[in-house]
Amino acid sequence: MSTTFDKVAKIIADTSEIDIDTITPESHTIDDLGIDSLDFLDIVFAIDKEFGIKVPLEKWTQEVNDGKASTDDYFVMKNLCAKIDALVAAKTA
């Protein structure tokens, strides 16, 4: 996961004005890092491009809104990276 984490942290730092050193696996992208929805869309686009996947952001948002998932499930860095790894693995399977 560290490679995925490093890439995602760099994408976040490059896309927003967040210092890469403040991004940890426990960081919540919205609550802790203060990433707004427009920046997050740019970040997701960059993640899609970097990893060759399509992050199902609408599905994740709907699951959170419907109470089927916590925001932590998708937006805490370590969980986001695990989801990205799963999407990459599913694509290559």
UniProtKB/Swiss-Prot annotation:
Please state the protein's primary subcellular location: cytoplasm
- Give this protein's Gene Ontology molecular function annotations: acyl binding; acyl carrier activity
Taken from the UniProt entry, a GO cellular component term is: cytosol
Q: What pathway or pathways are given for this protein in its record?
A: Glycolipid biosynthesis; KDO(2)-lipid A biosynthesis
What keywords does the record list, in alphabetical order? Cytoplasm, Fatty acid biosynthesis, Fatty acid metabolism, Lipid A biosynthesis, Lipid biosynthesis, Lipid metabolism, Phosphopantetheine, Phosphoprotein
Is RNA-binding one of the keywords?
Answer: no
* Localization (cell): Cytoplasm
Q: Spell out the Pfam families in the cross-references.
A: PP-binding
Question: Its function?
Answer: Carrier of the growing fatty acid chain in fatty acid biosynthesis. Is involved in the transfer of long hydroxylated fatty acids to lipid A.
Q: Which PANTHER family match?
A: ACYL CARRIER PROTEIN, CARRIER DOMAIN-CONTAINING PROTEIN
Q: What is this protein called?
A: Acyl carrier protein AcpXL
